[in-house]
Amino acid sequence: MIDDREAFGPDEFEQATADLCLRDGCAEVEVVGGAGDLGADVTAVTPDGRRLVIQCKYYGEGNKVGSEEMQRFGGTCFTVHEADIAVVVTTSEFTRPAAEYAEQCGIVCVDVRRLREWGGGTGPAPWALGPRATEETTPLDQDLW
């Protein structure tokens, strides 16, 4: 499983996320994470031609993605990286303020539950969840926190 912390480290998590994008039809998939990435760990073009920018947060249970991290990504994902769809994927969860900020800014949150569903093929890809999705969108779950 993509969220198996014993099988993956942070670099492998970024690669596994990129592999899911490839599996689900994205093109030009690139792992760009590392020092100086300005929040973009994976970039791709969705099957319908939109630019996808993903930040991967490889966190342990109980270590949630916070508002400050979300705001840093929010400051670069659309302006610097020119994302049509911005996504934060985590092996954990999001704090309420982080999820609220993401919703206000149009950033898609993929927590450990959604990650398992996406990885297992039982849930949608992140680009089908966002406010700019071309299909019917899924509202922000209230159980993220």
Locations of the language-model features?
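Mixed-charge (Asp/Glu-Lys/Arg
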Residues: 1-38, 43-145
